[in-house]
Amino acid sequence: MSKPSDHIKRPMNAFMVWSRGQRRKMAQENPKMHNSEISKRLGAEWKLLSEAEKRPYIDEAKRLRAQHMKEHPDYKYRPRRKPKNLLKKDRYVFPLPYLGDTDPLKAAGLPVGASDGLLSAPEKARAFLPPASAPYSLLDPAQFSSSAIQKMGEVPHTLATSALPYASTLGYQNGAFGSLSCPSQHTHTHPSPTNPGYVVPCNCTAWSASTLQPPVAYILFPGMTKTGIDPYSSAHATAM
């Protein structure tokens, strides 16, 4: 890289005058020594010199400075340092703070690859879910079997709508779920006739074990009537 012809060098100071001969001598004695290492050693040796030893070099530096001022009266020292790249300094204008791992599996301290095993085994993944308030999903029609409805009737009447995960989103009111079967209120729910996936409350009397009887099949032979078999028919005939 060629230097500009109008560039004016600075006048040497006392250390530069002294080190000019010392640098050449040290480079000849240590040809493999780097220039930066030579400068460090020369600086340490210059500090060890006394004022009497430095005086000749200080006087020589003053003479060179006076001569430099005569030759270049308008000289002003302007360092040719390259400006620092502001883009490198402010590369990230809006630094983002570290928020930690957002993966709940990593936060739980699971080893790498454990998430794949949990996806393939739903039973293992279910252990990390919070316990649900409702034992059955309100969106699965297959859950509404006779045993499921019977278990839903055993839910205490203190169950609030906020305890059910889908009650607010499906539009259920407190009264709908607050009227689940309770021994003191004698109310229960029935599956919806139009949509099996929903249950509707009713205020009819509670079912008892005596009233829940299976249907009876009747076989009538020639010459026989249903009067002697059906108690309701006999009672109706007596009233007539």
From Swiss-Prot:
Binding region for DNA: 8-76
Highest taxon above the source species:
Eukaryota
Q: What keyword terms does UniProt attach to this protein?
A: DNA-binding, Nucleus, Repressor, Transcription, Transcription regulation
Keyword Transcription in annotation: yes
Any Pfam family from its record, for instance, is: SOXp
- Its predominant location is nucleus
**InterPro entries registered for this protein in UniProt:** HMG_box_dom, HMG_box_dom_sf, SOX_fam, SRY-related_HMG-box_TF-like
Gene3D superfamilies assigned to the protein according to its UniProt record, in alphabetical order: High mobility group box domain (1.10.30.10)
The coiled-coil segments of this chain are: none
GO BP term, pick one: negative regulation of transcription by RNA polymerase II
Q: In which tissues is it expressed?
A: Highly expressed in developing brain and spinal cord.
Sample GO molecular function, one term: chromatin binding
List, alphabetically, the GO terms of the cellular component aspect. Answer: nucleus; transcription regulator complex
Where in the cell? Answer: Nucleus
Query: What is the protein's known function?
Result: Acts as a negative regulator of transcription.
Q: Which PANTHER family match?
A: SOX TRANSCRIPTION FACTOR, TRANSCRIPTION FACTOR SOX-14
Write down what this protein is called. Transcription factor SOX-14
Native species: Mus musculus (Mouse)
The gene coding this protein: Sox14
